């Protein structure tokens, strides 16, 4: 009988977290333990690492457009990282985002890898972990409560209740909270106004946590967060209300990177979790930077496909990290590419070379998008049991015909042994890497130019169309002097377009911009397209229905 992911994780022989830390030259004095198998790294160790003069190679892991069939990007990141560390004997750290509990109990499930390529303790990482998500949710909702109290207690600056732009947050998928009215009833209950909730991972405070370099930077960024506008339409920021210290205090511990291990005891930093469709989609700057100072190779996974997390890492995050990736991995699967052609999961287990050829257009777009940055690229095929030799041979030949190296990886079933060839190739590419990155846009471009360049170069759109609301917001941002900030485009993860049903590699379409939101503390503008939601709902059969716990406290059903 095939073991489930959680059964494999629960049967693992974990090392004490102090032993995992020792692999990186960290002592028990450098850690703030959360039990036996996880810890935060303290500021003393972080500052010492920054002074050691060492900087490892950075490998970005991205993928094709996600599908219900699953791509296994986290599994590939962990498997290849394990192989570099254990098969090649090179000091390696894996850097991943923290899972959000919303998808864990919803449709997507967890984000700790799969099979014999997982980070552990799997249940903790997918649920409460070290409490970072709870700290963020508390900070988000305390900020909103303080703002509403400010209005209730006199509102000296004349903050217009109808122009509050910050939202409340929850780490729960709950569609009923997308639009609410607060303060109903008597004046004793506060000022009545419309409000909204968004998923914690999509809130600006999550982005700030992932971009801050230390507590001083964290506090400064929180102070810059736009709260709303006055009755005279003047912007009001958190620092104008004096709340930045309290909110930073709530996040000061969450800012420290979390250290765990893989099933094969490779060190892993799992820290920060912004979604790539509604935010910037990459783990924290602090954890990646720490990993680079403590190891020779760092694998960092970007959310969703190369058009989302990958593009945002290369155009934005790497500028804040002040390091470009030395190489990139693009993950693909036979069954996901067949889905791009068939648009159904009904027959994905059956051999279909024609569907694979047609669906290859999606991978072709993604791998060429990444190569357009001049970065060396390895394409890996995550092999599934239903893949036929004919399908694997065809896909590998299609990839190599485009001039890309390709390796088939079986880490899900075999652990690091199944990723050795991919590890050897990506290390070779990273070691030889010497290129000048060609980003999608120049930082000096205005917002419209940045949006157009990403839309045309990465999505292959023909045109960009703005609603009247979006046009007004562009004017306001220019008036505020914020029209040169980087852009984070919020778009469906399932398509290069803003239409979830347009699969494959469409061209000649129009990207529809519905609105622009200033994330002043994070230092970017979110560009909303199509019908993207920042508070998901639950499916008809949520994953929660399959999760249980027995009388000993042993959890089952997580994946």
Swiss-Prot record:
Transmembrane stretches, start-end: none
SUPFAM superfamilies linked: P-loop containing nucleoside triphosphate hydrolases (SSF52540)
Keyword Nucleotide-binding attributed: yes
Enzyme nomenclature, EC number: 6.3.4.3
Single GO molecular function: formate-tetrahydrofolate ligase activity
Binding sites annotated in the UniProt record for ATP: 67-74
Domain of life: Bacteria
Gene3D superfamilies on file: Domain 2, N(10)-formyltetrahydrofolate synthetase (3.30.1510.10), Formyltetrahydrofolate synthetase, domain 3 (3.10.410.10), P-loop containing nucleotide triphosphate hydrolases (3.40.50.300)
Gene Ontology BP annotations: tetrahydrofolate interconversion
Pathway this chain belongs to: One-carbon metabolism; tetrahydrofolate interconversion
UniProt catalytic activity: (6S)-5,6,7,8-tetrahydrofolate + formate + ATP = (6R)-10-formyltetrahydrofolate + ADP + phosphate
Keyword annotations of the record: ATP-binding, Ligase, Nucleotide-binding, One-carbon metabolism
Keyword field contains ATP-binding: yes
Recorded family membership: Belongs to the formate--tetrahydrofolate ligase family.
Name this protein carries in UniProt: Formate--tetrahydrofolate ligase
Organism encoding this protein: Lactobacillus delbrueckii subsp. bulgaricus (strain ATCC 11842 / DSM 20081 / BCRC 10696 / JCM 1002 / NBRC 13953 / NCIMB 11778 / NCTC 12712 / WDCM 00102 / Lb 14)
Lineage of the species this protein comes from: Bacteria, Bacillati, Bacillota, Bacilli, Lactobacillales
């Amino acid at each position: 009988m095939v073991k489930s992911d959680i059964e494999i994780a629960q049967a693992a022989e974990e090392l004490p977290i102090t032993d995992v830390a020792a692999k990186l030259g960290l002592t028990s004095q450098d850690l703030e333990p959360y039990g036996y198998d996880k810890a935060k790294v303290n500021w003393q160790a972080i500052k010492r690492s920054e002074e050691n003069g060492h900087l490892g190679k950075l490998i970005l892991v991205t993928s094709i457009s996600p599908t219900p069939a699953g791509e296994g990007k986290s599994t590939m990141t962990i498997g290849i990282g394990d192989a570099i560390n254990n098969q090649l004997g090179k000091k390696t750290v894996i850097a991943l985002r923290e899972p959000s509990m919303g998808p864990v109990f919803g449709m997507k499930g967890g984000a700790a890898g799969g099979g014999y390529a997982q980070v552990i303790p799997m249940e903790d990482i997918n649920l409460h972990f070290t409490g970072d998500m709870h700290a963020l949710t508390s900070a988000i909702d305390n900020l909103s409560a303080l703002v509403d109290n400010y209005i209730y207690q006199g509102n000296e600056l004349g903050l217009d209740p109808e122009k509050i732009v910050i939202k409340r947050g929850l780490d729960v998928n709950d569609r009923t909270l997308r639009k609410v009215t607060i303060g109903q009833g008597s004046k004793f209950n506060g000022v009545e106004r419309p409000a909204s909730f968004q998923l914690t991972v999509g809130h600006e405070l999550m982005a700030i946590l992932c971009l801050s370099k230390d507590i001083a930077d964290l506090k400064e960024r929180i102070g810059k967060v736009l709260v709303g506008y006055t009755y005279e339409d003047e912007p009001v920021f958190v620092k104008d209300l004096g709340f930045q210290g309290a909110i930073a205090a709530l996040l000061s511990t969450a800012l420290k990177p979390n250290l765990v291990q893989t099933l094969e005891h490779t060190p892993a930093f799992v820290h920060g979790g912004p979604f790539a469709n509604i935010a910037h989609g990459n783990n924290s700057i602090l954890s990646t930077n720490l990993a680079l100072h403590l190891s020779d190779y760092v694998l960092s996974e970007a959310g969703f496909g190369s058009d989302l997390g990958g593009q945002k890492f290369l155009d934005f995050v790497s500028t804040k990290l002040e390091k470009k990736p030395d190489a990139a991995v693009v993950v693909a699967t036979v069954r996901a590419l067949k889905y791009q052609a068939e648009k159904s999961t009904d027959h994905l287990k059956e051999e279909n070379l024609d569907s694979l050829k047609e669906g290859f257009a999606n991978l072709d777009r993604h791998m060429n998008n990444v190569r357009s940055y001049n970065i060396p690229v390895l394409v890996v095929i995550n092999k599934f049991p239903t893949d036929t030799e004919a399908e694997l041979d065809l896909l590998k030949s299609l990839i190599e015909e485009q001039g890309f190296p390709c390796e088939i990886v079986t880490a899900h079933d075999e652990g690091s042994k199944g990723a050795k060839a991919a590890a050897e190739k990506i290390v070779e590419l990273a070691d030889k890497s010497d290129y000048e990155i060609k980003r999608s846009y120049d930082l000096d471009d205005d917002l419209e130019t940045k949006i157009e360049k990403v839309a045309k170069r990465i999505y292959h759109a023909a045109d960009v169309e703005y609603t009247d609301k979006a046009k007004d917001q562009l004017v306001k941002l220019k008036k505020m002097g914020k029209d040169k900030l980087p852009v984070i485009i919020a778009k469906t993860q399932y398509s290069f377009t803003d239409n979830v049903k347009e699969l494959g590699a469409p061209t000649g379409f129009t990207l529809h911009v519905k609105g622009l939101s200033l994330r002043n503390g994070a230092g970017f503008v979110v560009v909303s397209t199509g019908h993207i939601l920042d508070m998901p709902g639950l499916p008809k059969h949520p994953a929660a229905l399959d999760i249980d716990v027995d009388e000993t406290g042993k959890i089952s059903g997580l994946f």
